[in-house]
Amino acid sequence: MLLLELKKTNQTLETIHFIGIGGVGMSGIAEILHNLGYKVQGSDLSENYNTKRLEAYGIKIFVGHTPQNITNVSYVVVSSAINRNNPEVKEALERKIPIIRRAEMLAELMRLKCSVAVSGSHGKTTTTSLVACLFEAAGLHPTVINGGIINNRSTNAYLGSSNYLIAEADESDATFISIPSTIAIITNIDPEHLDYYKDFDTLINAFRSFITNLPFYGFAVCCIDHKIVRELVNNITERKVITYGIDSDDAHITAFNISTDITSSTFDVKISLPNVSGVTIIEKITIPTPGRHNILNSLAAISVGVELDFGIKAIKNGFNSFKGVKRRFTKVAEYNQASVIDDYAHHPEEIKATLSTAKNIANKQHGKVIAIFQPHRYSRMQHLFDDFMRCFDDADLLYITDVYAAGESPIEGISGQSLIDNIIKLKYHNQANFLAKLDDSLEVIMNKASPGDMIIMMGAGNISNFANELPQKFGNLS
């Protein structure tokens, strides 16, 4: 980055090319580099919200991957999803163009900043957004690189004016260990990305390194409601750790007097920090998003704000300004007085949290929960097949589509149909159905939706596109 800075100063800018620039992680870094004045371009297999947004900023976007796309580039940036068989990667190797991993480029952006890195199996994107809102309310105006679209800004990344940078740290391939952060947040740790880590212990050890790699003056923020995180924290003595939770009375920061509805959550906070006498209570914090898991995400942000002495007013103002994150329990349509929710949940624990929130709301409205789930990646489904069978308890009606491959090859015996077959066979759900086509969801909604129902469309694939097209589809029916 220092070399790039020197070249920028000398007006000898060279082009940085992003392969897979439409991904949430890649697009954010590309946008920040562009805003810093670097020459950026990229390619992706198809257009999406991110590519169109970047193109509107003046960033050149190629649809499709071909060697010709990198004719005049000096650096190529790739994520872990891009393999060496990619034609642009092959061309870069042939021409000896430096290939930089996404996490390395993120690390370079963070190196010269005071950085907050948010990691964990679930909740990273919302937590990153909440932390950013608190920094803004405290007048610190950070640079932010997130894994989802922040509704306040309609982007997943923006350049701030201060020396602070807040970033979502992806744990999928252990590169998050090398991110030079001052503050590290761990929301939870579940068996995920085992195709890379091979076993759960290796993943846990990576999170340990994430904390111990902090500078001595930094600190970690960890949710000890989660058993694995608690065990991890109990064995760390070389770094300062602030803990939070709802069910953990021994946590430094806890929530109580909790109430939720379809649009928000309200709660009080108790603060009891180590080596600080007395207890502080913050009353009636409200966030415009429902769910216990989002209260936990808020507690992570509060922990950072308290430790950095933002003050109660800034913390409350920060939450008041928060407008949520795209695809996190987002209402996209209504049909027959039933709400259609678009949600990114694609891991069993995320599904349970989302459906629990939906069930709580549906019960208050005398409705039912209709879950429509699109599995994401054959490898994830294979590793967590048993957990997927057990995670739909809060759905009154369950519909599962086939797997969104995300570039993976099929695995024998792993499919949406096989998941449904096993759920029925082992009696985990008595109202489970397979949808041969995602388009069949429209008929399900039309035939099953009743007033007060919560229709939850979940997954990390293209189910979101379908969900967001529903208002138009409903309009065409009239």
From Swiss-Prot:
Keyword terms: ATP-binding, Cell cycle, Cell division, Cell shape, Cell wall biogenesis/degradation, Cytoplasm, Ligase, Nucleotide-binding, Peptidoglycan synthesis
Single GO BP term: regulation of cell shape
Pfam families: Mur_ligase, Mur_ligase_C, Mur_ligase_M
Annotated binding of ATP, by residue: 120-126
Cell location: Cytoplasm
Biological or metabolic pathway of the protein: Cell wall biogenesis; peptidoglycan biosynthesis
Enzyme Commission numbers on file: 6.3.2.8
Superkingdom of source: Bacteria
Catalytic activity: UDP-N-acetyl-alpha-D-muramate + L-alanine + ATP = UDP-N-acetyl-alpha-D-muramoyl-L-alanine + ADP + phosphate + H(+)
GO molecular function, one term: ATP binding
InterPro entries recorded: Mur-like_cat_sf (IPR036565), Mur_ligase_C (IPR004101), Mur_ligase_C_dom_sf (IPR036615), Mur_ligase_cen (IPR013221), Mur_ligase_N (IPR000713), MurCDEF_pg_biosynth (IPR050061), UDP-N-AcMur_Ala_ligase_MurC (IPR005758)
A GO CC term attached to the entry: cytoplasm
Membrane spanning stretches: none
Main localization, broad class: cytoplasm
Role this protein plays: Cell wall formation.
Family: Belongs to the MurCDEF family.
PANTHER family the UniProt entry points to: UDP-N-ACETYLMURAMATE--L-ALANINE LIGASE (PTHR43445:SF3), UDP-N-ACETYLMURAMATE--L-ALANINE LIGASE-RELATED (PTHR43445)
Name by which UniProt lists this protein: UDP-N-acetylmuramate--L-alanine ligase
Organism: Rickettsia bellii (strain RML369-C)
Lineage: Bacteria, Pseudomonadati, Pseudomonadota, Alphaproteobacteria, Rickettsiales
Gene: murC
